């Protein structure tokens, strides 16, 4: 029998529920030094930034927000050794990452005399390891003052780098875990992407553009295909799960269209340049 090294054993023993509990414990440690004050991340946010945060809505502090999101209940389950869902884990992580983002923005812009202390790098590292194990990534959107978690999708990130900021947010948001099963929100994002892709007609492979047009116009995205002149009988009895699968396929087709257009309008010119230099 082949002996496994300690690093293989460490990976095998990884438990996302225990990791959530560890992160919760770390969150209770002081991580910001401001003058003579030593504060936890949440204490810093509550005292200096919560009311200024664009996404605080009607909540009064971090504790109020955690209670509403069910995070306190999630942590209780972890500490008692009960199981928690991946979605509960992602809600907790997204909350923590937004608290971190608020602190980082504040220290960079307002409280530049403050600085993070030793537990902070460990918190960041453990979050990144947990996200990697879950196959998720976090994305910052400065304009919206928010951090969201999305499944890793290299095509989506490539497209987000190409398009304008508002559409980039929609491209990334499509993969947000809370949008699973939300056909209305997915449909609205696909409509916005369809408007973008339509302008690329002349640059796209005819077969690809034809498939894009068919999907955008016939599965209740651009048009109401459930009634009226554009009604499609097949859609009247289709299960939501199957329709969502087709929405996800359409999303991938639209990403391909945007990437192909970028290749033909930008990348090919760069390749011509390098060909002229490297012979």
Language-model features, listed with the residues they occupy:
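Alpha-helical oligomerization segments
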Residues: 191, 201-279
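Short, hydrophobic/amphipathic alpha-helical patches that form generic packing surfaces
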Residues: 87-105, 195-199, 248-260
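Conserved aromatic-histidine-acidic binding/catalytic patches
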Residues: 81-84, 115, 180-188, 242
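Residue-level detector of well-ordered alpha-helical segments, enriched
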Residues: 85-95, 119, 185-192, 211, ...
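Short amphipathic alpha-helical segments and their helix-coil junctions
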Residues: 65-80, 166-181, 230-237
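Charged interaction/catalytic cores of defense and host-pathogen modules
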Residues: 1-127
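A mid-sequence, solvent-exposed acidic-amphipathic segment
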Residues: 168-197, 201
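Helix-loop junctions and short alpha-helical segments
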Residues: 86-169, 175
